[in-house]
Amino acid sequence: MCGTDEYGTATETKALEEGVTPRELCDKYNKIHADIYEWFEIGFDIFGRTSTRQQKEITQDIFRRLYENDFLIERASQQPYCEKHKSFLADRYIEGTCPKCGYEDARGDQCDKCGSVDYGPLDLKNARCKIDPDETPVVRETRHIHIRLDRLQPEIEKWFTQASDKGAWSNNGKVITESWLKQGLRDRGITRDLRWGTPIPLDVFSDDTDKEIYKDKVFYVWFDACIGYVSITANYTADWEKWWRDPDNVKLYQFMGKDNVPFHSVIFPGSQIGTREPWTMLHHLSTTEYLNYENGKFSKSRGVGVFGNNAKDTGIPPDVWRYYLLKHRPETADTQFEWRDFIAQNNSELLAKLGNFVNRIIKLVNSKIYNSIIPDYTAMHSDPVFVEAKKEINQHLTRYLKSMEAVNLRDGLQDAMDLVQAGNNFIQSHKLDNKLAANEPEKAATVTGIAINIIHLCASIFEPYLPATSKSILEQLEAPFLPIPEHWSGEDIKPGHQIGKAKYLFTQIDPKREDEWREMYGGTQAERLKKEEASAKKAAQKAAAKAKKAESKGKKLGEQGVEATATQGAKPADPNKEPVDAVTDGVQQVMLPSS
């Protein structure tokens, strides 16, 4: 279950930038997201969106329950107001210096550098309007509704203690939530002065003045967004309550970056608790740290990094991307995306280990020795050597299952690759080749039969990670998918079964492509900064030399009694400035800004 979170200031801001309506923008990006996930072979029962009728109905119903149960309070506050645009500026329309870390481009609701979300737009230093950076916001009073998280804290804390323990949350998810609770929860505004969003249900207000105040306000995106999981389910099935109103029989697993944790571990659960209704609540929270790019940070605005829509353009199959990204999933610490490493892991791991193991065995069975028919491997199947080999495979399988049950996805992938290595070691230790088949046919048949069944098991355990690879293995084996067993027998593909023809699972990536891709997708930030600084320095030196030359020429002309003029582009020089000043005014125009 997934979808696009479409309401909020970010949407309004982007729509303004692109010159379209918020609805047009959301339609565009919902399709882009859906197409990317389809290409990556990420499957959902439904990939939905939050700008729907169901979202409005469910969000407003939760709000009414909170209102009735006295968990909401109205507060007047001072908010930034743009006199030029005649409107209050929502958090994301304000940018400035983060009060926590000093980052100069922090938003009014969140700092992308340090991750802080526990400050307001008025806390920013050197605040400016995002729409028009030359405008400095003024402060005016506005009224908003807040959820009383302080009153809900004891219940949130009790729920969190139980859920995080039973659900074995990721450590960073627990630490972030504990930090919020330790500081003490405060009431938090859940309405905003925006147009694009879920409207406030005015029927809860008895006073006409209140209705007038709130008729042009909408819900804060992070009160509204988490309800999207529920509304998207409701878009999928009319029986959505069987999933979301059955806490005893349904377990909710959620996956996210660490900066979104508080909204899912505090605000949304608090909203659910406050309705006094039975809700399916978060069971397991799987959170990640940050994936960085070439020793720097990904940045869409600066074009640094390869993003989902770029991956397809490289011509590299989705499974290679899935393997690398899952192997580098930042589960416990930040990780790096590096092109050299990306290429190396395709060539030395996917191709050299998994690909070659599968190809070697299937080609052997395709050969004249077996004519694509699985030999009778039963004669020596119970031999202690082979029993021990199957035991080792089962040990790797057990570790894999344990990792997957704990949602340790990176470890699960490594466990699967360890099983492949065990398979490779198995056939190498027995020197499986034409000579063994000729001299010891029973032993060769047993090694081949066990190896074929290891490959069959690989198709199953790699399916969550490499679906296209899994499908190709099964097609080559001409065998059905094997549900991942708790214990592997090594006998699922029987003697006499005819397999298909061998195909390569992976291809070599030319290491020379590293430079091409690094240049195409921005390279390292350090290199980009170095180039920008060098260009700026060169431009400044050139401008200074030009200014010096103009000054020298001006003096010479002055000595000759000739009126000196200087030009700046196609414009005449300022008559109130000396010639040198007129020329140096152009320096800023050619200076490249560092970033």
Name each model-derived stretch.
Residues 1-2, 54-58, 126-367, 414-416:
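Structured secondary-structure scaffolds
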Residues 81-84, 287-290, 340-342, 375-382, ...:
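A glycine-rich phosphate-binding loop feature that marks nucleotide/adenosyl-phosphate handling sites
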